[in-house]
Amino acid sequence: MNKEFIPYEQALELKQLGFDEPCFAFYDESLYFPNNENQYGTFCNQKLDVPFCSAPLYQQVFRWFREKYNLDISINTVYSKYNEILSRKYSGVIDNEGVFTNVGFYDTYEEAELTCLKKLIEIVKSNTPKP
């Protein structure tokens, strides 16, 4: 189940970008799942001190980027055949208001997913004015 949550490093970067959606778990460098939802509720970055941060799911983060920044991703399966050997790779593509960026080809879906997430963070950081 841990692979459904984004890594700690990216969760910290998202906290800096203003991600504050309710999450079912949080990081204190390692992933922490509360035992009783009624006792702990959900976690938002606004309520968590440093170094704690919420632990969002990939789908949550991708929805946030889509709704807040109009950035969308797709991960496509690409097959190739060489010398009668069929291979499968995963290609991540970011749609930035009609400008498509291919982030590469990866052996696993999860690698493509993480690379897309890192690229989304990079895009938003590069377009955010510094204080």
Task: Pin down the residues of each PLM region.
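N-terminal segment of the canonical double-stranded RNA-binding domain
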Residues: L12, Q16, D20, S30-D107, ...
